[in-house]
Amino acid sequence: MIVVSNTTPLIGLASIGRFDLLHAIFGEITIAQAVYDEAVVAGRKEGGAKREVSGATWVNTVSVRDRLAVEVLLDELDLGEAETIILARELHADW
């Protein structure tokens, strides 16, 4: 099963101490590079998902190939959301 996540579930579950639920339910998840950047690079040290995402071997970070499709979505969405949608399409994600 291919699962692609955006930043909100990562930070939300990390903030309540239940980041592990993603692994328990899905095994592995895939995130776009922009999601990684939001959660880890720009993430807050406390209350975010920096520690959880960077330490999870079951979270895979993948770069989106179709940059033009991402650019089109940026009129309505932020970069993390746009990359997540395009990555899910590129990988034929189940979730």
Across the structure, where does each feature detected by a protein language model lie?
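Active-site-proximal, substrate-binding regions of enzyme catalytic domains
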Residues: 1-4, 8-95
